[in-house]
C-alpha cells in the first residue's frame, strides 16, 4: 500500500514538471512574436524613408547637352504624374520647357534609382533641347510595360531674351520698306517674250517654206542644218 502511494506521488510530480515546462515555453514564444510584429512596421517605415530620400536626391540635377547648352532640371509632383522642368543657357540666351508623364506605376517596383539615372542620361543626349515639340524622354526600364512613363514636352522653347529698342526699330523700318520694293513685270520678262515669238514663228509662211525646201533638198537628217542657212541667207524676222 505504501509502495503504491509512492508511485502515484512520483507520477504526479513528473506531470507537474512537464506542465510547468510547457507553460514556460509558451511564455517565451509570446513576447518574441510580438517583438517581430512590432519591428516589421518600423523596418518598412525606415526603408520607405530611405527610398524617398533617394528619389528626392535624384529628381534634380545639372547637365550639358551635345550642342553645349548648360541646363538644370527638377521634378515636381502633380495630381496626375509629374512635371520635369528644364532651364538652359546657351550663347547668352536663356530658355526653358516642361516635360510631363506618369512613371508612378513603374516606380512601385523599386526601379526609381534606375529610372531617374536613365532620365538624366537621356537629357544629356538631347540636341536642340526644348525646340522640338515632339521631344520625348524615354527610359529602357519603363518604356515597354509603362508607356505613360515617357516624358513628353508640353510647352516648347520659351525665350527669356528681350529685343532691344534699337533692334525693334530696325525691324519696323524693314517692314515699312517692304511695300516700296520694285516689282518685276512678269509679262515683259525675256522668257515670256521668247515664248510668244516662238509661237508666232511656227506659223510664219516664210519659215514654213524654208522648212519644206530644206526637207526636199537636204533630207530629214540635214533639214535643220539647211533651214539654218536658208534663214541666214533670206534674213527672216524669225
Curated annotation (Swiss-Prot):
Record localization: Secreted, Extracellular space; Cell membrane
Matching InterPro entries: FGF1-bd
Region feature Disordered, mapped onto this chain: 25-61
Induction remarks: Down-regulated by retinoids.
Region annotated Sufficient for interaction with FGF2 and FGF2-induced effects, chain positions: 197-238
Membrane topology: Peripheral membrane protein
GO biological process: cell-cell signaling; fibroblast growth factor receptor signaling pathway; myoblast proliferation; positive regulation of blood vessel endothelial cell proliferation involved in sprouting angiogenesis; positive regulation of cell migration involved in sprouting angiogenesis; positive regulation of fibroblast growth factor receptor signaling pathway; positive regulation of myoblast proliferation
Membrane-spanning residues: none
Record's GO cellular component terms: cell surface; extracellular region; plasma membrane
GO molecular function ontology, one term from the record: growth factor binding
Disulfide bonds: 71-88, 97-130, 106-142, 201-238, 218-226
Main location: secreted
Signal peptide bounds: 1-20
Glycosylated sites: 164
Tissue spec: Expressed in gut, eye, thymus, skin, lung, tongue, Purkinje cells and cerebral chorioid plexus (at protein level).
UniProt KW keywords: Cell membrane, Disulfide bond, Glycoprotein, Growth factor binding, Membrane, Secreted, Signal
One Pfam family here: FGF-BP1
Subunit structure: Found in a complex with FGFBP1, FGF1 and FGF2. Interacts with FGF1, FGF2, FGF7, FGF10, FGF22 and HSPG2.
Family: Belongs to the fibroblast growth factor-binding protein family.
Task performed by this protein: Acts as a carrier protein that release fibroblast-binding factors (FGFs) from the extracellular matrix (EM) storage and thus enhance the mitogenic activity of FGFs. Enhances FGF2 signaling during tissue repair, angiogenesis and in tumor growth.
Protein name according to UniProt: Fibroblast growth factor-binding protein 1
Source organism of the structure: Rattus norvegicus
Species lineage: Eukaryota, Metazoa, Chordata, Craniata, Vertebrata
Amino acid at each position: 500500500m505504501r509502495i503504491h502511494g509512492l508511485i502515484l506521488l512520483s507520477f504526479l510530480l513528473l506531470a507537474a514538471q512537464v506542465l510547468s515546462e510547457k507553460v514556460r515555453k509558451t511564455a517565451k514564444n509570446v513576447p518574441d512574436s510580438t517583438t517581430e510584429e512590432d519591428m516589421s512596421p518600423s523596418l518598412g517605415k525606415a526603408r520607405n524613408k530611405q527610398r524617398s530620400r533617394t528619389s528626392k536626391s535624384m529628381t534634380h540635377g545639372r547637365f550639358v547637352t551635345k550642342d553645349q547648352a548648360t541646363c538644370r532640371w527638377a521634378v515636381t509632383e502633380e495630381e496626375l504624374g509629374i512635371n520635369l522642368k528644364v532651364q538652359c543657357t546657351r550663347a547668352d540666351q536663356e530658355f526653358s520647357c516642361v516635360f510631363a508623364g506618369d512613371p508612378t506605376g513603374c516606380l512601385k517596383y523599386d526601379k526609381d534609382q534606375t529610372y531617374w539615372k536613365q532620365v538624366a542620361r537621356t537629357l544629356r543626349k538631347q540636341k536642340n533641347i526644348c525646340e522640338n515639340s515632339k521631344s520625348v524622354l524615354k527610359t529602357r526600364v519603363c518604356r515597354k510595360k509603362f508607356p505613360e512613363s515617357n516624358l513628353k514636352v508640353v510647352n516648347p522653347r520659351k525665350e527669356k531674351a528681350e529685343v532691344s529698342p534699337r533692334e525693334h526699330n530696325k525691324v519696323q523700318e524693314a517692314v515699312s520698306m517692304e511695300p516700296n520694293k520694285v516689282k518685276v513685270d512678269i509679262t515683259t520678262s525675256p522668257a515670256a517674250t521668247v515664248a510668244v515669238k516662238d509661237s508666232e514663228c511656227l506659223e510664219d509662211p516664210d519659215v514654213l517654206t524654208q522648212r519644206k525646201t530644206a526637207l526636199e533638198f537636204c533630207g530629214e537628217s540635214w533639214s535643220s542644218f539647211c533651214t539654218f542657212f536658208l534663214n541666214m541667207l533670206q534674213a527672216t524676222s524669225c
